[in-house]
Amino acid sequence: ERLAEILGRKEEEYGHPIYLISDEPYREIVFSGFQAPWIPHLYRDTIVCYSFSKSLSLPGERLGYVLVPGQAADSGEVYAAVAGAGRSLGYVNAPSLFQQVTSLCCDMTADLSVYERNCKLLVPALREMGYHVAEPGGAFYLFPRSLEPDDLAFSERAKQFDLLLVPGSGFGAPGHFRLAYCVQTEMIQRALPKFQALADSYRLSLIHI
C-alpha cells in the first residue's frame, strides 16, 4: 500500500502512467498461512507476469501469462505492445497438447507443503552449523552468506563435498550463495552432513593458519 501511494503521487508529479510489473510465479508458494496480496487491487497501473512452472512443479516449461488489467492506463496500447513483443522477440512455444493439458489443471497446484517442510529442516540446521541464513517466507530458495568473502571460491570448494551451489555474484550479491530446496526431503537430510563437513573444513583451515 505504501508503494502504491508513492507511485500514485509520482504519476501525478510526472504527468504520465508509471507501470508496476508484478512478477508472480511464486505467489502460491508462501508459508505459515500467509496470502500474497493481489497487487492490481492496490495499484491501478499494475502488469502481472505469471508462470505455472512453479505452482504445478513444471521446471523449465514456459507456460504462463501476462495480465494487463482493463483498469490500467492505456491498457489497450500496453496489451498490443506485449502481444507484439511476444511475436517479434522470438521464443519456443510449449507443445500445443501440453498447453491444453495445463489449461485443465491451472487452478490446481502440486503438493507445495514439501517446500515449507524442507525449509524448516534446512534453516535451523544450517544456523547451528554456523551459516548465516535468513528464513524466507516462501518460494524454494535460501540465500545464505558464504563462509568466505569469495563466493565463487566457496561454491567451487563445496563441490568437493558433492554440494552444487550457485554463487551470489550472479545475482548481484557477492559473499552469498543460492541454495534450492525444491527436492525430496530425503535429499535434504542426506545433504546436511555434507554442509557440516564443508563448514568444518573452514574451521580446520583457521586452526592451521
Label for each model-derived stretch:
Residues E1-L206:
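PLP-dependent class I/II
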